[in-house]
Amino acid sequence: FALLLLAGEETGSFGAKAFRGQHPGAEWVIVGEPTDNCMASASKGTKSFEVEFTGKAFHSGYPEHGTSAVNLFNDFMNALRSIVFPSDDILGNTTWNIGRLSSDNPQNILSPELTCRVYFRTTFESDEMVCNVMKNMAGPQARLRFGRPRVQDGSDIVAKEVAPWQKAM
């Protein structure tokens, strides 16, 4: 049995990684993280992909001679927005966002390079699908940075409503 109070959960889960290194294979762990003051026995998984788009730099006055990595990114985003990920009765909808976007070049030059991070919160139904979609859409440019599979302990309790006095806090 162990108690883990998470540190750095939004920036790399450094506390959880340190814990795992010192306590590999702990049979039972209570994880304390700031999630609405409720108990949960299931949580969404996480998948973070870094995707690089490579264009061809050229002066913006002659765009026909280059390829904008920003336009390639826009095509990718339009395709990703069109995907309907399955909903899950327990964990709800799959959600995603672009957490980091980088393209550093002069404003009058077609961007030769753009990198983004796509962060997914996956469900029982969508965990594997997300990986397949990203592999197919971004091809070899997509690199899985880290991921945590969706978790459920087998109980019927997913989340317990907080007490009224806790809501006031």
Model-derived regions: residue spans:
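Acidic/histidine-rich catalytic neighborhood of metal-dependent amide-processing enzymes
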Residues: 1-48
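Metal-dependent amide/peptide-bond hydrolase catalytic core
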Residues: 9, 34, 41, 47-169
